[in-house]
Amino acid sequence: MSIDFKGRVAIVTGAGGGLGRQHALGLAARGAKVVVNDLGGARDGSGHSLTAAESVVAEIRAAGGEAIANGASVTDWDAVQAMVQQAIDTWGRVDILVNNAGILRDKTFAKMDLADFRLVIDVHLMGAVHCTKAVWPHMVAQKYGRILMTTSSTGLYGNFGQSNYGAAKLALVGFMQTLALEGAKHDIRVNSLAPTAATRMTEGLMPEAVLAALQPQAVVPAMLVLVSEDAPTRTILCAGGGNVEAANITMTQGDWIGLDSDAPERLAAQLDQVRDRAGDMVPPNGSAQGAHEVAHATARLT
């Protein structure tokens, strides 16, 4: 099965370098028309320049593809709306959104300024919200859309000194879970990708030998599958160095602790059993937790 994007229009945010650049090049190489969005700022989000986005556009055009540059900040709702309109005015539609833009403001939580916490949330989470909100009505109208959230192992599992980044990245998974349910009837499929790649964002975070093995282009195949015609939905893929894994948010079978006054003590005594991963499940939606608990309660109380 060949994956191609002929006739499709994609927006890739944070595409002026690193992973976003590789995403834009990968989509264009397989026929997509690409809006290369990049604020052109520093790793911490400061500054602005269209040079990086224009450079990627030049690469795509030199290879025979179609692309336009856009310098909107994903934190600016009006600018994001204008970016989507730019795609519509140029090519008549928007089929794919890759939410990739991000910054880092790493410090331990004790030392972190709340402004730095909020800014990381604004760029990663609200930036994705803005872009997704702007493309959503177009995707609903055309009964087709593919949206990718860039999550992270930090969001899924935690990382020292990245409480702001981790909070934003796990929030994107929750955002994905609900949008996938809401978009299903419109053939809008929403997924998440947790990349491990050597980029400007990861400089200084890992040893050089490790970074050398984690070239950003190795993540692109996972991205292409997650925004393809036959993409899954509500899927989290982790990718790096040529390896791909799937991550799931699971729930154990749990255990009955009852309603008596000693329920806290029972839970403390049974905590290992409650946390036992044998037979754990991936709930199809948020209501499944309540349904599971009601079924157990009904069985015990009747």
Report residues per predicted region:
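A glycine-rich helix->loop->beta "capping" turn
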Residues: 6, 63-66, 86-99, 105-108, ...
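Active-site helix of classical SDR
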Residues: 132, 168
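Substrate-binding pocket helix/loop in short-chain dehydrogenase/reductase
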Residues: 60, 108-109, 116-121
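The beta1-alpha1 cofactor-binding region of Rossmann-like NAD(H)/NADP(H)-dependent oxidoreductases
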Residues: 50-54, 71-82, 114
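Canonical Rossmann dinucleotide-binding motif of NAD(H)/NADP(H)-dependent dehydrogenases/reductases
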Residues: 3-36
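Residue(s) in the substrate-gating loop at a strand-loop-helix junction
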Residues: 152
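C-terminal helical subdomain
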Residues: 192, 210-301
